[in-house]
Amino acid sequence: MKLSFVIILFALTNFSFVEKPVQLFNTSLTVTVRDEVGNTVVGASIKLFETEENYTKETNAVAEGVADAKGVFRFKKLKAAPYFVLVKKDDKDNSGGGEKIGKLEEGKFNKVTIVIQ
């Protein structure tokens, strides 16, 4: 009787709690910056904003980076949320087109290409 009770109790405790699966990868966003003819842009500043108001005022960026020699920067450990992206290099930027990206997929390597002109 005691053995049956222990077995039932053990079975109930193992199956009554569902653990959240372990996330293997952090949510990230890789931004590739290109100019109007498709060439990658080295050294462009990239800022991510959570709201359109912050994007418009260029305040409270949640993350910032600079495009590398291949015109790429990877933001790591982001929330799975939509973002407004502002990219600038000298007198070129991406204002007026494609500033908002959709909600990032959680635990995935998200990618976007931004054109500046």
Enumerate the predicted regions with their spans.
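Short, acidic Ser/Thr/Gly-rich low-complexity loop/linker segments typical of extracellular
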Residues: 54-72
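A short, solvent-exposed beta-strand micro-motif common in secreted/extracellular proteins
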Residues: 79-92
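Short, ordered, surface-exposed loop/turn motifs in non-cytosolic proteins
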Residues: 37-55
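Sec-dependent N-terminal signal peptides
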Residues: 4-13
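Beta-strand-rich domain onsets/edges
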Residues: 14-28, 32-37, 95-98, 108-117
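Surface-exposed loops/turns
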Residues: 69, 79-80, 106
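Exposed beta-strand and adjacent loop surfaces of beta-rich binding modules
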Residues: 28, 43-45, 82-84
